[in-house]
C-alpha cells in the first residue's frame, strides 16, 4: 500500500487527506480517479471560491426560472383556459440544469474541509480533513436544506399533478403550483444568503468593481419585482377561473343547464356540447372583468383582463407583469385598488411591506457601492480645497500657487489617489521584492554602472527605489546644492545644465529622457572609502521640462549598495562610469576643446616661425612653457608636421599673432605681480578659472574588506 501523493501537483490549492491511502494503480487514469475520489478541498482555496461564485449565479438564475411556471396557464378562448406547452418545456429544461448544479454543490460540500471550532482561538484555525467527520457534520447541518432546494417539485406539479387532477384538466391555475414554488424559495434563500456571506468572508467582496456591486443589488430588486409580477398574473388567472366555477355551480344547482368542469378547458372547444353550453350560459356575461356591471369583484386583478395581458403573447405578457411588479414595489402598493377579497388584501399588504424593505436595502447597498467609486475623488477634492485655503492664508504669489496646483493635479493623474508606498509596505518582503523587481529592474539595468552588478545587488537597489513626481519647471537639483538622491527617469524630459561654478561664458546642457539618470555625484561620494557625512554638491542644475515620473534612490541606500559592490572590482565598471557620467563628459569635452585650441595656436605659431625663419616665434610670449609642452605631448604626441600660409594673408596673420602674444604676456605679468603681493584689483579678474577634473571613485578593495 502506497501513500497517495498530494494533489498540489495536479490541481492548485487543493488538499489531500493525510489519512487516505490506496493501492498502487497500473495506469495514470486510475490514479487520477482515485485522487478525485479521496480529494479534500480547502474551503478558502481558489477552486472552492470559484465554484461558490458559479453556484451563486446559478442559484439566482434558478430563482428567476421558477416564476416562469406561473405564465404557463393563459386564457385560450371564451370561458376556457389552456397551457403553454413550449414555455413549460423550456422552463423545465433549464430548471433541471439548475437542479444538477445543486446536486454538484451537495457533492462539493461532502468533499470540503471545515475549521474545527475548538481551534479558532488563534489564527485561522485547524482544518478537519477526515472525510467521515466532514460527512457527519454536513448531514447534521445543511444537508436537508440542500436536498429540499434540489428537489424538482415544480416539474412534478406541472407535468404530473395538474394533468392527473380529477374531473379533467381545467384547473391549470391550481394554487398548488404557486404554493410549491414559493415554499421551495425558502430553502433556496437559506442557501443563497449564507453563500453570499461566505464569499464575502473569503474574498472580501461579492463583486470586484463598484458598478458590478450596484448591478448585483439591482438584480435582486428586479428578482423581487419579477416574482410579484408573476404572482399577480397567476392570481388574476385564478380569480377568473374562480368566477367561471361559481357561475357553473349556480347553473348546476338550478339544474337549468349542465356545466361540466371540462368545459372550462380549451381542449373541449370543438365538442358540440361545449358549443351549445357556450351559446346559452351566462358565464361570459357574469365574469367579464372589462364590464362595470359585473357583480364579481376582480379588484386589483381586473387590470390583467382590461389590458388583455391574459390573452396576449408571452413576451408582451412578461414585460407588462415585470413593469407591474416594479411599479407597485417601488410605490409600496399605493396605486393598487383592492376589493374586500381576503387573498387580495393580504397580497397588497405583502407588497407594501416587502417594497419598503427591499427599496431601502436597494438604496443603501447601491449608495455604498457607488460611494466606494467616488471616495478617493472626494478625498482629493477636500485635500485640494484645504491646499487652496492654505495658499490664500499664507498669501503665496500667483505663479507659486499655480505650480502647486499643477503638482497636485499631476499627482492625482499619476496615482489616482492610491498610496503606493503604503500598499507595498503592507505586503510581505518577498512579494514586495518581486513587485519592485518587476517595476524597476529593466530601468535600473539601463544604467551602465548598475548593469555590471549581480542580481542580488540589483534586487537590493530595486527595493530601495521610491516613486518621485515633478511638474514642468521644477528644479530637482540646483548647481552647488547638496545632492541627496539619484533619479532614474520613467516618463518626461529633464534638462541638465552647468555653468562650471558660474564661469562667465561657459554653459553646458543636455536633455535626459526615459531611461537616463541624474545625480551621479552620489556615485563618486558613495564609492569613496573614507567619505564624510557631508553630501556632495551638485555640479549641474537639473530642471524638469515636462511632467516627470521617476524612481529615486536615496544617498544612504546608494552608500550601502556601493559599499557592498566594492568587493566586485572591475576596470570595465570604471570606464562605464566615466563614459556615461554627464559630469565626466562635460569635463572631457572641455579638455579636448582646450587641447585642440592650444594645438591650433601652436601650429599657427610654428608656421609663422618657419616662414619668417627669424624670430617671430617665442614660446614664452605665446604663454606656453615646457610643462604645457610635455602635457600636450603626453596626451596627443609630438608635432612633426609643418604648414604654409598664403602670401596674401601673411601680413595680417603676423600682426594678429603679435597682438595675441602681447595680450597674453601682459595678462601673465599682471597675474604674477598679483601673486607676489602687488595690489592690483584688476589682475584677479583677468585670470580665467579652470574646469576642474571630477573626482575619481575608488574601485579598489580595502584591506579591511579582504
Curated annotation (Swiss-Prot):
Binding locations of a nucleoside 3',5'-cyclic phosphate: 449-579
The segment annotated Disordered runs over: 661-706
Which molecular function term from Gene Ontology is one that the record holds?
cAMP binding
Q: How is the protein disposed in the membrane?
A: Multi-pass membrane protein
Q: In which tissues is it expressed?
A: Expressed in pollen grains. Not detected in leaves, roots or root hairs.
What residue intervals traverse the membrane? 54-74, 87-107, 143-163, 175-195, 218-238, 346-366
Identify the residue ranges that face the Extracellular compartment according to the record. Answer: 75-86, 164-174, 239-345
Functionally, this protein is described as follows:
Cyclic nucleotide-gated ion channel required for directional pollen tube growth into the transmitting tract. Acts as a Ca(2+)-permeable divalent cation-selective channel inhibited by either lanthanum or gadolinium. Regulated by CPK32 to mediate Ca(2+) transport across the plasma membrane in response to Ca(2+) oscillation.
Gene3D superfamilies cross-referenced by the UniProt entry: 1.10.287.70, Helix hairpin bin, Jelly Rolls
Give every IQ domain span.
585-614
Q: What species is this protein from?
A: Arabidopsis thaliana
* Observed phenotype of the null mutant: Male sterility.
Q: By its UniProt entry, which PANTHER family does this protein fall under? A: CYCLIC NUCLEOTIDE-GATED ION CHANNEL 15-RELATED-RELATED, CYCLIC NUCLEOTIDE-GATED ION CHANNEL 18
Q: Please provide, in alphabetical order, the Gene Ontology terms of the cellular component aspect for this entry.
A: apical plasma membrane; cytoplasmic vesicle membrane
Q: Where is this region: Calmodulin-binding?
A: 565-580
Q: What is known of its domains?
A: The transmembrane domains are indispensable for pollen tube guidance. The binding of calmodulin to the C-terminus might interfere with cyclic nucleotide binding and thus channel activation.
* Disulfide cross-links: none
* Recorded family membership: Belongs to the cyclic nucleotide-gated cation channel (TC 1.A.1.5) family.
In Swiss-Prot or TrEMBL terms, this protein is called Cyclic nucleotide-gated ion channel 18
